[in-house]
Amino acid sequence: MIRATKLAAVSALVLVAAAAAAQDDGFTKKFPLASCQFISVGGNRYFPLIPGRQLYYSNAACVAAGKCDALNELWITEERETKRITLPIGGTTRTVVTRVVQERETEDGELVEISRNYFANCWPSRDVYYFGEDVDIYKNGKVVGHESAWLAGRHGARPGIVMPEDGFITGSRYYQEVAPDVALDRAEHKRTGFATRVPAGRFDNCLEVEETTVLEPDDIGHKTYCRGVGLVKDDDLELTAIYANPRPDDDNDNDNEDDDD
């Protein structure tokens, strides 16, 4: 999920070294999945899952300041669609209904990527888990690749946590993606309890997360999440507008479903 970071080609030697480093790197990668009753709506206060909501991000301020060469834009849409993902949990096979969240990225108006991400809320902890993503990379209007795509339950991939419920402790470390050789993004809590201002407004009760991956150790990203809103900053991208259009029956979780096959 690190923006603009897609693994195109990694040598066998690098992959072996990365796998070894991931074995015991101080980041939690095993989670109490068996105790979860997964649902596809709700989320938590720092990562809401609200079908019909769309958030728009831009680095226009960075461009205007002369610090960025290209205008990058990102639309995150929490779809009404769900996806059923079957995977082994706690010694048995379970099917989890996940929320589809689409990310659409452009650079200077040209489409560069569309990804469909799959999240579910663990009840009663309200930790939001990440179950994978389908990725389309674009060039000149055509799909040219699917780098970094993964799905829990396939090829040894397991869910990671994208955002824990309010148990945000500075210094906490955990894996967001657990897909060997493909996606091994990690999160570390850096600071909390501050306010931030972006084009969409001023937000309180914010927290900062640093993201890294053993596959590309020099790539470091920073995200800011604010209570009641979710992602507000993604490196130089800033939340610019929120479009909310939920249906009254969204909480019934009767959306159209897509199987994992």
What spans do the regions from the language model cover?
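Hydrophobic h-region of N-terminal signal peptides that target proteins for export
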Residues: 13-21
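Conserved functional acidic sites
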Residues: 23-253
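Asparagine/serine/threonine-enriched low-complexity, disordered tracts
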Residues: 252-260
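Bacterial N-terminal signal peptides that target proteins for export
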Residues: 1-9
